[in-house]
Amino acid sequence: MKATLVNRVRSTIDPRDNHPYLNGAWTPMFEEWDAEDLGVEGRLPRDLDGVYLRNTENPVHQPLGKYHPFDGDGMLHAIAFEDGKAGYRNRFVRTAGFLAEQQAGRALWSGLAEMPPRSERPGWGAQGALKDSSSTDVVVHAGRALTSFYQCGALYQLDPRTLEQHGPAQWHGAFPAEGVSAHAKVDAASGELLFFNYSKQAPYMHYGVVDRDGRLVHYRPLPLPG
């Protein structure tokens, strides 16, 4: 196996912090790696060709107040299989919030459990005070891995094999101002992406469809009586 350290991000998390969601299996990592020709127990089928993607919450900075695991910065892990071999790489999702906090060298937004919010800048999502960490979900559509935020935000695009970053999805200028919630689904037969979003202002929810080429073809409000 050959492993290469690609990058190490700047972190301010106090190693003495004993929060259960910052330790043990939840201990964050701050390095980005490429690893080729991973060691294998047994044998990988040579016709196994594809990528396994896993999204995680991986906080970088000491929280502003109470911490919830949903607050962690998005990180993708990828294991690629080809010709009987496997390779690994991981990358932070370069969201607007992640980049702003890297520049500031500290947390700028408080999290889900901190009420009232202590965020120092306007936030994203239905609540409007949180960082869009794009750490909740990942789905592959139109050749791109799309990461998303549980309270509605941008869909950040990455190459599913290399994890090269391509910024927020634009959908040819038609991306909804209300954002997109996590847990969009892809229709395996049509290649369409099916999604929803929600907000505190009427209309409170929308449903939409994006075709296999990344064009928004359907976007309608859903009535929510009461």
Language-model segments: residues:
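N-terminal regions that are enriched for targeting/export leaders
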Residues: 1-124, 130
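Well-ordered mid-protein domain cores that form the structural environment of catalytic cofactors
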Residues: 95-218, 223
